[in-house]
Amino acid sequence: MSDIVRFGVSLDNTLLKQFDRFIKDRNYTNRSEAIRDLIRQELLKKEWTEDQEVAGAITYIYDHHQRDLLNKIIDIQHDFHDVIKSTQHIHLDHDNCLEIVAVKGNPTTISKLSNALKAIKGVRHGSLSISGVGQIA
């Protein structure tokens, strides 16, 4: 027998219509899938605020011609070696590089790393994508 539990949800008609548009826009096949995803997202946010072990990816684009930029990036990465699991460097064009840093550890430390990398002069764009480490069903 499945561990799936059915329960009812009462919603205002306007909210339900907005939710159904959300489901269609995100290509969910049904409301249950969308609700499960939203619940997981909220539980994941809770993990990040409670300093539980988490995982994620930091991505940033930079001009590799910027003076001393690579040394600054490497210095910061070495300062946070305990949470960095892997890095991937991609040449986007002659001037721009994309770097993806896979991280796992304390969310406060990961956020500090992300902020430090994004704050370097020459980094054009950066973002932190959060995930869990498999604790959420």
Curated annotation (Swiss-Prot):
The keyword Nucleotide-binding does not apply. One of its GO terms (molecular function) is nickel cation binding. Binds 1 nickel ion per subunit. It comes from the Bacteria. Disulfide bonds: none annotated. Ni(2+) binds at H78, H89, H91, C97. Its cofactor is Ni(2+). Keywords: DNA-binding, Metal-binding, Nickel, Transcription, Transcription regulation. GO terms for biological process: response to nickel cation. PANTHER family: NICKEL-RESPONSIVE REGULATOR. Belongs to the transcriptional regulatory CopG/NikR family. HAMAP family: NikR (MF_00476). Transcriptional regulator. This is Putative nickel-responsive regulator. It comes from Syntrophus aciditrophicus (strain SB).
